[in-house]
Amino acid sequence: MIRKDYHHGNLKEEFLKIAFDFIHNDDIENLTLKILADKTGTSRSAIYRHFSSKDDLIKTIIEVGFDEFDKHISPILLNKNENLVDRFYLATKGYIYWAKDNPNLYRLLFGKKYAPLRESLLSIKDDSCKAFVSLKQTVQDGQESGIIKKEDSYKQAIIIWASLHGLSSLIIDDFLDVQEIYEELYNDMFKSLLSGLISNKVKLISSIPFVNNILKPKEL
């Protein structure tokens, strides 16, 4: 076997890149340290210098995976150059698309099997999950502007997140035949979420046509 000349400083990144490429097409359970060694032309002992075990590797994948997930969601939610309703719509739709495009990684991040590893890194209970913090902050922004009902922002964010997780799971696990209509289902779900969250004192202002068709008695 021809061994590649990897620098010590980038070998860990190479292992992670191979791991992410692998789980894009296959389940994390099928990833072995031997696969990493073969792909990089290194020995398994080289892997153990960076990861003490497969669980340690998976824990790092979870940590990096959540960072990637957050980069896909938070900038949209926190972009105050866009109106709040559009931010909600685009970010939450982005959540669905990210799950659909990364089903194995999504299951790894949010599934039950590796929950102990995940919970050793972050939790929505202590604000260490950055994407959830951004969602809750956007809910609070909406409350302060009078758009969203002034209720428990944590519970409101949980309702949004749970709805997104439910639809995402149905899509990626083919539990229901929704592949052809998931965008329509998402729009219907978004309208239902808005109906429960939006203050009755405002009319929604949005660049999204179907949102503007939700009538409220007063122009914001």
Task: Give each language-model segment a name.
Residues 11-20, 36, 61-65, 69, ...:
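Generic hydrophobic, amphipathic alpha-helix propensity
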Residues 104-137, 176-179:
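Short secondary-structure transition hinges
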Residues 14, 25-56, 60:
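Helix-turn-helix
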Residues 3, 63-88, 120, 125-131, ...:
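Amphipathic alpha-helical linker/stalk segments
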Residues 54, 61, 65-69, 91, ...:
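Hydrophobic/aromatic residues within well-ordered alpha-helical segments
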Residues 121, 143-191, 200-220:
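Hydrophobic/aromatic-rich alpha-helical bundle segments in the mid-to-C-terminal region
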Residues 23, 58-65, 109, 117:
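Alpha-helical DNA-contacting segments of helix-turn-helix folds
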Residues 60, 74-105, 160, 209-210:
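Hydrophobic alpha-helical connector segments
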